[in-house]
Amino acid sequence: MNIIEGKLNLDSNTKIAIINARFNHIITDRLVEGAKDAFLRHGGKKENLSLILVPGAFELPYALKKAIESEKFDAICCVGAVIRGSTPHFDYVSAETTKGIANVSLNHNIPVSFGVLTTDTIEQAIERAGSKAGNKGFEAMTTVIEMLNLTKEL
């Protein structure tokens, strides 16, 4: 049986964008730091990493689509944080953001990772942005690196 999997290394020319939803920036800044750390630890060059900032999670799919269409990047890592409040807004934003990123990803030939936290509390978000539960920005970047390399093998 042949096993095909992506490796966790980047060549010196790989260009990756992080698209960051600034809303809840206390959390998302930490996700970006985790993603940058993963990029550099796996062989990426600082000058080949771009950070695209959008106001909130709902804007991620549109920015993702435009970034892909620019043909400047080999892969894209989306990060953000949607934290439940006292209104149904959380449900709409988290669902549409997830669907939007998935739809854009499946309709283009470029690896995309989903590092958008959807949590019930700020404490859960903090845990996933670099404390008890690791850093989901770091994980999203390693995922997109692995998928980029897997794509080359398929």
UniProtKB/Swiss-Prot annotation:
This chain's function reads: Catalyzes the formation of 6,7-dimethyl-8-ribityllumazine by condensation of 5-amino-6-(D-ribitylamino)uracil with 3,4-dihydroxy-2-butanone 4-phosphate. This is the penultimate step in the biosynthesis of riboflavin.
Where is the catalytic site? Answer: H89 (proton donor)
Molecular function terms, GO-annotated: 6,7-dimethyl-8-ribityllumazine synthase activity
- Keyword line: Riboflavin biosynthesis, Transferase
Cite the CDD domains for this sequence. Answer: Lumazine_synthase-I
Q: Does the keyword RNA-binding apply?
A: no
Substrates-to-products reaction catalysed: (2S)-2-hydroxy-3-oxobutyl phosphate + 5-amino-6-(D-ribitylamino)uracil = 6,7-dimethyl-8-(1-D-ribityl)lumazine + phosphate + 2 H2O + H(+)
The record's gene field reads ribH
**Membrane-spanning regions, if any?**
none
Domain of life, per the record?
A: Bacteria
* Amino acids binding 5-amino-6-(D-ribitylamino)uracil: F23, A57, F58, E59, A81, V82, I83, F114
**So what family is this one in?**
Belongs to the DMRL synthase family.
The EC number(s) this enzyme carries: 2.5.1.78
Q: Origin organism of this chain?
A: Campylobacter jejuni subsp. doylei (strain ATCC BAA-1458 / RM4099 / 269.97)
An example Gene Ontology cellular component term from the record?
Answer: cytosol
Tell me which Gene Ontology terms the entry assigns under biological process: riboflavin biosynthetic process
* InterPro entries, per the entry: LS, LS/RS, LS/RS_sf
Q: Which residues bind (2S)-2-hydroxy-3-oxobutyl phosphate?
A: S86, T87, R128
Protein name, as recorded: 6,7-dimethyl-8-ribityllumazine synthase
Enumerate the Pfam families for this protein. Answer: DMRL_synthase (PF00885)
Q: Under which pathway is this protein filed?
A: Cofactor biosynthesis; riboflavin biosynthesis; riboflavin from 2-hydroxy-3-oxobutyl phosphate and 5-amino-6-(D-ribitylamino)uracil: step 1/2
